[in-house]
């Protein structure tokens, strides 16, 4: 089978390379600009973005062992904001770290103790003109807890265990955990929340 793709100019390829001595190209050059709207301000509800480039949430494993934000996380996200992204969405942030983690060093938002670090993170993103959102998350049946939980007891093959089906009360409690996570995100200065 042969795959064919449109010419690179159609994709709007961005090429990054170091400046040569005596040049002031800032290291990033557009090979073409077939989508000029991409670089225009955009809106999500009442929120205005400087452009329509969005960095999606991607798990980095950069959180501190207890789920707090350290300098490595701040540096990582600040670099993306400095690079010109319009909206930075911070990775999988646990609403229940004790039994809802997907990755070992996952950011936490299930306790007020995390708000200060998350505030420093949102401030670092905002400092460079980007907007910030945070993805709040519970692993459910994908969790690594002793007893994973989910709305139904359906296993995710091939390597996960069958989760315990949540009770109605546990589902209500989980809704409350997401609401509390969203409240903490707002207290920390994030412009939006993505529910995972």
Residue positions per predicted region:
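Serine residues within intrinsically disordered or low-complexity segments
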Residues: 4-5
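Flavin-dependent oxidoreductase catalytic cores
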Residues: 10-196
């Amino acid at each position: 089978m042969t795959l064919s793709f449109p010419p690179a100019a159609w994709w709007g390829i961005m090429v990054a390379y170091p400046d040569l001595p005596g040049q002031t190209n800032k290291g990033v050059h557009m090979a073409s600009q077939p989508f000029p709207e991409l670089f225009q301000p955009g809106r999500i509800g009442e929120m205005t973005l400087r452009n329509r480039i969005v960095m999606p949430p991607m798990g980095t494993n950069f959180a501190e062992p207890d789920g707090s934000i350290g300098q490595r996380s701040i540096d990582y996200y600040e670099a993306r904001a400095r690079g010109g992204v319009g909206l930075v969405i911070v990775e999988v942030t646990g609403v229940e770290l004790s039994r809802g983690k997907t990755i070992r060093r996952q950011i936490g938002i299930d306790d007020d103790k995390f708000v200060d670090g998350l505030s420093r993170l949102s401030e670092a993103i905002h400092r460079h003109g980007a907007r910030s959102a945070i993805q709040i998350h519970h692993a459910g049946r994908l969790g690594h807890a002793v007893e994973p939980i989910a709305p139904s007891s359906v296993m995710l093959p091939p390597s996960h265990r069958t989760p315990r089906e949540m009770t109605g009360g546990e589902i209500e409690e989980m809704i409350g955990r997401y609401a509390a996570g969203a409240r903490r995100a707002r207290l920390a200065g994030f412009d939006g929340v993505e529910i995972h």
